Amino acid sequence: MEILKAVENVNNRQKRILFKKLYNHFKGELAGKTVALWGLSFKPETDDMSAAPSIDTINMLMDAGCHVRVYDPVAMNATKRRWSTVYCGLDMYDAVKGADAVLLLTEWRQFRIPAWQIVKSLMRTPVIIDGRNVYDGDEIEEQGFTYYCIGR
């Protein structure tokens, strides 16, 4: 049982890492910030959100006073049922309009190679927090973004 508790503790800490990176970037001033999330389901190619990190992430963002905008290719209906105040984008670009940061939570194929200049032009503050280590940080930074990932 101690091993299971340890695993659960690690999983809970992992869910907070992206929020912590965002919190640190904005020096704790998150109230009123708009944060876009790409990917809500537990893994690509499913609408299963039952154990998805997006649930805790959205709740933490809302508790901090953030405006949350999201896009997931298949999990939007579940999101609409769960949170009435979360904006569900029509596509990945609609979700980032006016965003101060984008958090990648699920590595759907369509999120792998976005048109970065379009993303940047739609955002208020070009900050990318890559929760799946999908992107090349140097390439993203060359495009004018501030880039954070996990474990680097």
Regions found by a protein language model. Name each.
Residues 1-152:
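Structural/interface elements that position substrates and couple domains in central-metabolism enzymes
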